[in-house]
Design a protein with these regions (language model features):
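N-terminal beta-strand motif that seeds the catalytic metal site of vicinal oxygen chelate
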Residues: 1-23, 72-74, 125-126
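Amphipathic alpha-helical segments
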Residues: 20-33
């Protein structure tokens, strides 16, 4: 019998205008740490880490931002949703409509956008 492949992790890649600005947001506002960067002064590709989460940030040319494209939406599972909501609310990352809410599909969650319009939803099963 052939050995079956095993999926271990997923590392989503988010498009950003400036990787250095994205690193600043994810590190200083959301509490991630820099995992790697392809260049220390003008990175075009980098990864940030927090707990068991790894997100990659990739520079995209300014012309690409002129197109009306949907940006990615990540759903990140957490256990203590209330504490995370409080942590982020103190960092001024929420938009006017960010609320901690219970959903009809059985989660408690909140969502907001990073400075590059990538959506971030943090949730736990209710």
């Amino acid at each position: 019998m052939e050995t079956k492949g095993y999926l271990h992790q997923i590392h989503p890649v988010l498009p950003v205008k400036q990787v250095i600005d994205a690193l600043d947001f994810y590190v200083n506002r959301l509490g991630f740490k820099i995992g790697f960067a392809d260049d220390s002064k003008k990175p075009r590709y980098a990864g940030v880490l927090r707990d068991g989460i790894e997100i990659h940030l990739q520079w995209h040319d300014a012309k690409e931002w002129e197109l009306a494209l949907d940006r990615p939406m990540l759903r990140i599972v957490t256990q203590n949703i209330e504490a995370l909501y409080e942590e982020f609310s103190e960092k001024d990352v929420f938009h006017n409509h960010t609320l901690l809410r219970e959903t009809a599909w059985g989660t408690k969650e909140f969502a907001f956008f990073d400075p590059f319009k990538n959506g971030l939803t943090f949730y736990r099963n209710a």
